[in-house]
Amino acid sequence: MFVSSRKTGLIVCFSLIGYTASAFSASLNPAERNETQQRQSEVIEQSRQQREALQQLNNIVQAPLKADNALQGPCFTLREIRFNHSTLLGQRDQTALTAGYLNRCNNLEQINQLMHDVSNWYIQRGYITSRAFLSEQDLSGGVLQLEILEGRLEKITINNQTERMTRTAFPAREGEILNLRDIEQGMEQMNRMPSQQVTIEILPGSQPGYSVVNLTREAHLPFTGGVTFDNSGQKSTGEQQLNGSLALDNLFGVADQWFISAGHSSRFATSHDAESLQAGFSMPYGYWNLGYSYSQSRYRNTFISRDFPWHSTGDSDTHRLSLSRVVFRNGTMKTAIVGMLSQRTGNNYLNGTLLPSSSRKLSSVSLGVNHSQKLWGGLATFNPTYNRGVRWLGAETDTDKSADEPRAEFNKWTLSASYYYPLTDSITYLGSLYGQYSARALYGSEQMTLGGESSVRGFREQYTSGNRGAYWRNELNWQAWQLPVLGNVTFMAAVDGGHLYNHKQDDSTAASLWGGAVGVTVASRWLSQQVTVGWPISYPAWLQPDTVVVGYRVGLSF
């Protein structure tokens, strides 16, 4: 059938108007919507990993010194206290430790207390194989000689064998003073790989003052993977999704981890379809971590306007390079600095014709802090981040843009935080907060959304997006019982809420959403099954959400 160019233009115009109107609450294209959901899911997963790592920290408790009347004896006035063979005790620390003992008469019990205080100074800072002791000496001259043994690392072994990966996973080096925090960091780097789970023992070395750190590792295959089936997709591109993932551990023997995952609409339809691919690696070096990831997303949707079929398609490719450094850790907290460079290219087409207004390349850099801490009997995370759009790598710029156009060279601040608290042995509370702020309008791929399994539960197809806002997630989990073969049965109840604030160029983005959900998960080592039922509680009238949202997920792991 022949259609004139003028008529074609009118059809396109009316079709786009109709398509936009039908998606009033969903201003993002399917690729952007998928990316924002993935980003929100990554925030949840990152907080979970931070809390798990926090549980592995060892808080060293100072042991009280038991009084021994047999040590009292005569007292000696001490004019000077020397710390022999100490490289870590600075002058200020020495002054603080000896302040209560100088120029006063001390008996052997008090001198023993001083040795205990000095040893605990080392232990509290993670130097668990260092200690102070006395050698035979004459105290009548008023000078006390404290001998300091700063225990050193002889070697790190795995199952009593030396392996190359310990050199990249552990910041500790042979011959250096042994610090528990360096060992914990290395264990954390190892345990991030499922096939390299280890336990630790510290053994005497072959020479005095030296120790061997031996890691015990059970035999596992060097890869893990899984397949999942769920209904997390969008109606326009297919609700039922089939996903597969594979992770390879220690491929090059340097504690490196490689992963790849792919997803596809389970119906593999020609008119409505979505597919995704993610791949990347992470590589540690002591307190540093280098990571790279690539993600690809494709969608296809067919809609009818004026009895004419229109094919809406799109694709996006995202590269992310990250570098992080743990700058502080002790027995109760850990803090890391994280930097990232990202590039995203997105293209959208209508009947095979590129739509320049919604196709672009954006680059950005970010700098953030990842902090986790044991707090009030629970586990807390706090991660602020600054994001800046840049012109690098051929990205779009803001040259000659009007004031109300979205910014490619944007400034954006985000904050994610969480708090996990065990109410009983089987009931836990988890609260999560996420916020975003930008003074100027953002493109859809940089906006935040409200509504969905990873933001405000109780909504799925209907959501709202904007440049600034926040949401708060609350859930109670009850691990009820364990079934043979099927595994643990856990019940969940959640109430979430969020708000997007007005932007002066886009008043329609203002909205408050509240939703609730209940669910049950049955999970074992190999099989997991989950069903959730959600419902909207409060929302703007124009959103018109579904009355009830049912989600399900079945997964197999190996």
Swiss-Prot record:
GO terms for molecular function: porin activity; protein transmembrane transporter activity. One of its GO terms (biological process) is protein secretion by the type V secretion system. It is found in: Cell outer membrane. Residues 1-25 form the signal peptide. InterPro entries: Hemolysn_activator_HlyB_C, Polypept-transport_assoc_ShlB, POTRA, ShlB_POTRA, TPS, TPS_OM_transporter. The keyword Transmembrane applies. GO terms for cellular component: cell outer membrane; pore complex; type V protein secretion system complex. Residues 34-62 form a coiled coil. Pfam families: POTRA_2, POTRA_3, ShlB. Residues 76-151 form the POTRA domain. Its main location: membrane. Keywords: Cell outer membrane, Coiled coil, Ion transport, Membrane, Porin, Protein transport, Signal, Transmembrane, Transmembrane beta strand, Transport. Belongs to the TPS (TC 1.B.20) family. There are 2 cdiBAI loci in this strain, this is locus 2. Probable outer membrane protein component of a toxin-immunity protein module, which functions as a cellular contact-dependent growth inhibition (CDI) system. CDI modules allow bacteria to communicate with and inhibit the growth of closely related neighboring bacteria in a contact-dependent fashion. This protein may be required for secretion and assembly of the CdiA toxin. Probable member of a two partner secretion pathway (TPS) in which it mediates the secretion of CdiA. This is Outer membrane transporter CdiB. It comes from Dickeya dadantii (strain 3937). The gene is cdiB.
